[in-house]
């Protein structure tokens, strides 16, 4: 995924609580985080909205201009809007009811690999969710403070798709 350019549908609209329109252009910033969440299974568990609010507050307190693009593919829009409202999530989200983002980008099926650190050109620099993994969060914060990927050491999260599985010898 590293270096892959994320494609945005022509009409991408972000709104508060999934209903009050805020903006429809992708922010131009050195870094941005894109997180895609489909609502199969426990949407609230995947989203962890209170943790995202804490992370956003941390970025703001550090005066880091890093937009976070929440792309939500709801199974039930009303339920997802209720979750946003219940958690007082006052940050814009894109309700992708037609799953256009996934159709254009073919995101990995594992939700742990559906959050991406993007550069100004929407190319993937890293993959991983900073609210689900403390080490990812620390890595992202280092990136934002340094401004580049040069000289990074330590563990990095990668994903590789392998379409063949060796089942051994069958008798």
Region locations from a protein language model:
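Short active-site neighborhood of thiol/selenol oxidoreductases, capturing the structured segment around
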Residues: 19-54
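Structural beta-sheet core signal
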Residues: 35, 68-71, 117
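Extracytoplasmic
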Residues: 28, 63-65, 110
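N-terminal "domain-start" segment that seeds a small globular fold
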Residues: 1-26, 47
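Structural microenvironment flanking redox-active thiols in thiol-disulfide oxidoreductases
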Residues: 41, 46-86, 100-103
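Thiol-/selenol-based redox modules, centered on thioredoxin-like
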Residues: 112, 117-171
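Short, internal strand/loop/helix patches
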Residues: 81-114
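Short, compositionally biased leader-like segments
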Residues: 78-91, 155-167
């Amino acid at each position: 995924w590293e270096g892959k350019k994320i494609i945005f549908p022509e009409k991408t609209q972000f709104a508060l609580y999934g209903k009050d329109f805020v903006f429809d252009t992708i922010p131009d910033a050195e870094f941005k985080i894109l997180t895609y969440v489909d609502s199969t299974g426990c949407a609230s568990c995947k989203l962890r909205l209170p943790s995202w609010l804490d992370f956003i507050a941390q970025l703001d307190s550090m005066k880091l201009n890093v937009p976070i693009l929440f792309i939500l593919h709801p199974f039930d829009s009303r339920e997802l809007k209720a979750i946003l409202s219940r958690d007082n999530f006052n940050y814009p989200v894109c309700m992708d009811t037609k799953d256009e983002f996934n159709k254009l980008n073919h995101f990995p099926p594992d939700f742990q690999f559906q959050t991406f650190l993007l550069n100004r050109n929407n190319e993937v620099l890293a993959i991983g969710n900073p609210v689900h993994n403390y080490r990812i969060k620390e890595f992202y914060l280092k990136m934002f403070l340094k401004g580049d990927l040069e000289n990074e050491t330590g563990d990095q999260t990668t994903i590789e798709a392998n379409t063949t599985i060796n089942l051994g010898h069958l008798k």
